[in-house]
Amino acid sequence: MASKEMFEDTVEERVINEEYKIWKKNTPFLYDLVMTHALQWPSLTVQWLPEVTKPEGKDYALHWLVLGTHTSDEQNHLVVARVHIPNDDAQFDASHCDSDKGEFGGFGSVTGKIECEIKINHEGEVNRARYMPQNPHIIATKTPSSGVLVFDYTKHPAKPDPSGECNPDLRLRGHQKEGYGLSWNSNLSGHLLSASDDHTVCLWDINAGPKEGKIVDAKAVFTGHSAVVEDVAWHLLHESLFGSVADDQKLMMWDTRSNTTSKPSHLVDAHTAEVNCLSFNPYSEFILATGSADKTVALWDLRNLKLKLHTFESHKDEIFQVVHWSPHNETILASSGTDRRLNVWDLSKIGEEQSAEDAEDGPPELLFIHGGHTAKISDFSWNPNEPWVICSVSEDNIMQIWQMAENIYNDEESDVTTSELEGQGS
């Protein structure tokens, strides 16, 4: 039995390597930017910080990323990294593919540098790290225990204490087990939601300050789910609304103004398997998406949750942890799966006619498949300052910063802007 499994693993490895070679050969035609970087340890989390600096006289801009480590029994860290991203007018020749490094392109003087700027000791791996929108120096993290930690990275030295002592600015108490979901309220400063394997969602207000030492107790604990709560997200336009999804296959909508924390305001059987992630559309107050172990992404309208608006199908394995709307385009959504693929979808193309040949590659709304990872993608983030730039991290230590070729998202035949495309609908 073991030898059969070993044989299957070897075959799969060979297929993955073959696919990667093909992907690499095609990168000059598919991308305007690809940067591949091997991290010292895998990161389970990634998020662009909103800050960007354009040094005078340079052909690049400086961007920052929040990362974490997942080590093999060594000290873990919360990491802030600095990234050089070439300007649009930087000399970039996509035909210079460096096959050994898996990188390509010459950016004039820029080689797409990625440097670790701040490392802060962390208790166990960083399951997820998210910055507070009102003050991006404040970062909340999920640990492998029940704790949620809050760090102000400006108050910590750039190099971690060699003793390994983890010294967060706040410890948030309320969960019994670990989890992944984490969401700051973009309308109410300091209000943080967290999802947990203990079947609950906790809400903290960090403005309330610690009761004892650095500990802040949960302001409310929401107990509607009957299984592991995988993800939680605040509505982006309503300060009291949030959604949660869980292994009980349900999507629940909650209102913090309600008198009850045990019953959601809306409940829907969202998928035929565990629901792993959700994301509210930043432009439309009614639209949200959920991703599931049933390999699909579902589109919902809050005005009628009985009816699923659309199902996106193309992933070959479960939508693991992440589905994110583009911060720049109302109709653009991305999802990543255990299938090592990151799919970018365009809602405005739903229902478009396509040839039989095109249909074999996927439905018309499947705009792009990023195939650069050879292991499961743990997290990804849209760059808030550079449209169409995504950073994705996978379980094999690889971090990729990439931007699909402009002719893929801009109609080649005409100079149609994205806003015009959005306006066309489906």
Curated annotation (Swiss-Prot):
It is found in: Nucleus. The keyword Repressor applies. There is a cross-link at K4 (Glycyl lysine isopeptide (Lys-Gly) (interchain with G-Cter in ubiquitin)). Keywords: Acetylation, Chaperone, Chromatin regulator, DNA replication, Isopeptide bond, Nucleus, Phosphoprotein, Repeat, Repressor, Transcription, Transcription regulation, Ubl conjugation, WD repeat. The modification N6-acetyllysine is found at K4, K119, K159. SMART domains: WD40 (SM00320). The modification Phosphothreonine is found at T10. There is a cross-link at K4, K101, K155, K159 (Glycyl lysine isopeptide (Lys-Gly) (interchain with G-Cter in SUMO2)). WD repeats lie at residues 47-122, 128-173, 181-217, 228-269, 275-312, 318-370, 377-404. The modification N-acetylalanine is found at A2. GO terms for cellular component: ESC/E(Z) complex; nucleus; NuRD complex. One of its GO terms (biological process) is DNA replication. Belongs to the WD repeat RBAP46/RBAP48/MSI1 family. Binds directly to helix 1 of the histone fold of histone H4, a region that is not accessible when H4 is in chromatin. Subunit of the type B histone acetyltransferase (HAT) complex, composed of RBBP7 and HAT1. Subunit of the core histone deacetylase (HDAC) complex, which is composed of HDAC1, HDAC2, RBBP4 and RBBP7. The core HDAC complex associates with SIN3A, ARID4B/SAP180, SAP18, SAP30, SAP130, SUDS3/SAP45 and possibly ARID4A/RBP1 and ING1 to form the SIN3 HDAC complex. This is Histone-binding protein RBBP7. It comes from Pongo abelii. The lineage of its organism: Eukaryota, Metazoa, Chordata, Craniata, Vertebrata.
